[in-house]
Regions:
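Local beta-strand N-terminus motif with an aromatic residue
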Residues: 44, 105-106
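A short glycine-rich, Lys/Arg-flanked "PGG" loop and its adjoining helix->strand segment in the class I
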Residues: 121-134
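Conserved beta-strand signature within the Rossmann-like core of class I S-adenosyl-L-methionine
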Residues: 135-143
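Short helix-loop-beta connector
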Residues: 40-46
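Class I SAM-dependent methyltransferase SAM/SAH-binding core
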Residues: 48-98
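Short catalytic micro-motifs in class I SAM-dependent methyltransferases
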Residues: 112-113
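Conserved class I S-adenosyl-L-methionine
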Residues: 1-40
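A conserved beta-strand element that flanks and buttresses the S-adenosyl-L-methionine
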Residues: 109
Length: 145
């Protein structure tokens, strides 16, 4: 029995607008996460959303007046296409851990991403050691239904 690559599944979801349900399904959790971390950040702050999908969290972060830069990364080509179509910002198509940002970030946000990795602990080490600014914050959510 073979398993399908998650990026292929999410590209299919984007094509049939199922990505919109991701926002409605995760908004409550993401809002709680952001309510915790935003007050902890220096001003202005930079942020990256790892597994950004259609970019809805990036758009939410851009709405904070003290947010100076937002980057999104996702492995689904169709999700990145939607992110670019729906908003302004910097979006990258790549699977991880094979991509590295050109700068470090004050906030690393991730929702429903880590369990798709073969080595999530290794990715967390990379995020902390290579992507996160000193005194930065990483927050990752995994919904449990």
């Amino acid at each position: 029995m073979s398993t399908r690559d998650a990026t292929d599944v999410f590209s299919e979801w984007a094509l049939i607008d199922r990505d919109e349900g991701m926002e409605s399904g995760h908004a409550k959790s993401v809002n709680e996460m952001l309510n915790i971390v935003i007050p902890m950040l220096k001003k202005p702050f930079s942020a990256i959303d790892v597994g950004c999908g259609n970019g809805w969290v990036c758009r939410k972060l851009q709405a904070y007046e003290n947010c100076s830069k937002v980057v999104g990364i996702d492995g689904s080509s169709e999700m990145i296409a939607k992110a670019k179509q729906k908003g302004t910002g910097e979006f990258h198509l790549s699977t991880l851990p094979g991509w590295k940002p050109s700068q470090k970030f004050d906030l690393i946000h991730s929702m429903e991403f880590l369990y798709y990795l073969k080595e999530p602990l290794e990715m967390l080490k990379i995020l902390f050691n290579e992507w996160l600014e000193d005194q930065g914050v990483l927050i990752a959510g995994v919904d449990h239904y």
